[in-house]
Each structure stands twice: as structure tokens, then as C-alpha cells.
Swiss-Prot record:
Main location: secreted
Protein's name in the database: Gonadoliberin-2
Domain of life: Eukaryota
Family: Belongs to the GnRH family.
Tissues and organs where the protein is expressed, per its UniProt entry: GNRH neurons lie within blood sinuses close to the gonoducts and gonads in both juveniles and adults, implying that the neuropeptide is released into the bloodstream.
GO cellular component annotations of the record: extracellular region
Pyrrolidone carboxylic acid carried by residues: 1
Residue list for modification Glycine amide: 10
Organism, as annotated: Chelyosoma productum (Solitary ascidian)
Chloroplast keyword on record: no
Length: 10
């Protein structure tokens, strides 16, 4: 399961 590069909280 990969996340998007801009999936960081903020």
C-alpha cells in the first residue's frame, strides 16, 4: 500500500 507524495498531514 503506497501513499501519495503529498499525503502528509498539514
Amino acid at each position: 500500500q503506497h501513499w501519495s507524495l503529498c499525503h502528509a498531514p498539514g
